[in-house]
A protein has these predicted regions:
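Exported/extracytosolic protein signature
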Residues: 1-219
Length: 219
């Protein structure tokens, strides 16, 4: 959007955070409402994903390492944009890792004058390209693989394990979580998430939450 906001960014609902559910368990995760409907793309399109990390806890901390797991038909774009954010590509080109946020403190939760819990966050973008032979739905999964407390000491997240995401097979990726409906579709834990694009079935020129497709904001 012209004001710098993203139409696919989550609307955060913290009304149940840190309350007790019907089973007597503490609710440790906010609700993040945002569409997971695949964005239409064409072959060779450039896609920018924004990876945003929220702090839902009572301690300041750092998302020291983040990994993005690239699916078939989506490739990393070498160049100044991704270099700025410290992305490093694995030998097979399927996993990209950054420590860009390791010095960016994500502050603990606060409460406003009305008692509403407010979450702080930090974010890092990654630029990818839809391959020339792409087809169908393309699912991109990212997760936090290392977190540290305000003193830079390794810390255990209260409701998720680092580097614990189970990646679907390439055959299963296109339909990943398609059976889950609604505005809030959580990841496997609260430190991973996904987004999808779908290649248009009609091709003229045919040239992962998503903020920009080939220099045009997603609406």
């Amino acid at each position: 959007n012209s004001n710098g906001s993203y139409t696919r960014a989550p609307i955060v609902d913290t009304s149940k955070l840190n309350t007790i559910d019907e089973n007597g368990k503490l609710i440790t995760t906010a609700i993040y409402n945002h569409t997971k409907k695949p964005v239409e793309v064409a072959k060779n399109d450039i896609v920018v994903y924004m990876i945003r990390v929220y702090n839902e806890g009572s301690l300041d901390g750092y998302a020291s390492e983040i990994k993005d797991h690239l699916p078939p038909y989506l490739e990393y774009v070498n160049g100044e944009f991704n270099d700025k954010y410290g992305w490093k590509v694995s030998e097979d080109g399927r996993t990209v890792t950054t420590r860009y946020l390791e010095k960016s403190l994500i502050e603990k939760t606060t409460t406003d004058n009305n008692g509403k819990i407010i979450l702080s966050y930090k974010e890092v973008p990654i630029m990818c390209k839809v391959t020339s032979n792409a087809q169908g739905k393309i699912t991109n999964i990212a997760d936090v693989t290392e977190c540290r407390d305000e003193n830079k000491q390794v810390i255990v997240d209260r409701d998720s394990k680092e580097d614990n995401v189970v990646l679907p097979s390439d055959e299963e990726l296109p339909s990943y979580k398609d059976d889950e409906k609604g505005d809030y579709i959580p990841g496997q834990e609260d430190d991973d998430d996904f987004d999808k694009v779908v290649v248009k079935k009609f091709d003229l020129a045919l040239r992962k939450f998503i903020t920009n497709i080939s220099d045009k904001d997603v609406t």
